[in-house]
Amino acid sequence: MAAAAQSRVVRVLSMSRSAITAIATSVCHGPPCRQLHHALMPHGKGGRSSVSGIVATVFGATGFLGRYVVNHLGRMGSQVIIPYRCDKYDIMHLRPMGDLGQLLFLEWDARDKDSIRRVVQHSNVVINLIGRDWETKNFDFEDVFVKIPQAIAQLSKEAGVEKFIHVSHLNANIKSSSRYLRNKAVGEKVVRDAFPEAIIVKPSDIFGREDRFLNSFASMHRFGPIPLGSLGWKTVKQPVYVVDVSKGIVNAVKDPDANGKSFAFVGPSRYLLFHLVKYIFAVAHRLFLPFPLPLFAYRWVARVFEISPFEPWITRDKVERMHITDMKLPHLPGLEDLGIQATPLELKAIEVLRRHRTYRWLSAEIEDVKPAKTVNI
């Protein structure tokens, strides 16, 4: 009888949320002291209706990479907090990615620390995917890649966040000719200073259905001949698939040994820019007519697009990034170290480029397209 009564008491305590909270509070010594809640206690067999124990705040979730990260987190039963600044209709596509109550949408102000603190205070994981391809009068590259990530990292550290993941770029370099890449490098440093255990992800150019990489090159057919600096013979690219990057980020969240490391996410093959763009046009069944355009002239053309009131198709900084060879960083761990086999460009290019075809070739397969020529430099 005594044993049975004792087992009943134990079962009652184990199901009592108030008791769990009291125990968690009593054993927490020193700031920051965070209460244990149901979303942090894993249960279920896996899948969207389970609870993974991860409560993740994903900054930049409304962007290209963000939708894939949110989907992978939701698929494993994580609770995802999504800060947003856009119209509510622009986040509707994210709602089906998690079970009922698992996706929480909160408006935030990137320059308001109280707003940032509010969206990270209940999370044990914070992922920063905030990015911008061009500068605006409201946010320049220093704001987007340095000041905002620094504030998020500092406030996440103060809130007791266990894992912080910051997405930078493979070619981030303080000496780069690109202002974008220089600020990416500074952003890595300030994040590491504010959150020493941060995981820094350095992907190369990312391709996928909604990208500004393959789609950008493919859309050049509207202008006729394709301008490339030095015809693309001096630039080497190693693009990586967006799903691989997303899986790598989620696996880094689950890997206890990833803290404090930097990861280089790249595709399996390197291509000369000339061969890469030629392959893009072959898959899109478009006529490839390249011509060499000096970079100073390319920048002048880009300046015309910058002063347009519409979204710029090209900017001077993008011209610089387009013609920078992707770094080789063999000393850094990569996708393979997180259990992911990088996807070849040739397997997924058709998903991105089919929409650039004319109606005649819309349903054609890609067996007749020769794979892009790779290089080892």
From Swiss-Prot:
Cofactor binding note: Binds 1 FAD per subunit.
Xref: InterPro entries: ComplexI_NDUFA9_subunit (IPR051207), Epimerase_deHydtase (IPR001509), NAD(P)-bd_dom_sf (IPR036291)
Disease as annotated in the protein's UniProt record: Mitochondrial complex I deficiency, nuclear type 26: A form of mitochondrial complex I deficiency, the most common biochemical signature of mitochondrial disorders, a group of highly heterogeneous conditions characterized by defective oxidative phosphorylation, which collectively affects 1 in 5-10000 live births. Clinical disorders have variable severity, ranging from lethal neonatal disease to adult-onset neurodegenerative disorders.
Gene3D superfamilies per record: NAD(P)-binding Rossmann-like Domain
Gene: NDUFA9
Post-translational modification: Acetylated on lysine residues. BLOC1S1 is required for acetylation. Acetylated by CLOCK in a circadian manner.
Name used for this protein in its record: NADH dehydrogenase [ubiquinone] 1 alpha subcomplex subunit 9, mitochondrial
An example molecular function term from Gene Ontology annotations: NADH dehydrogenase activity
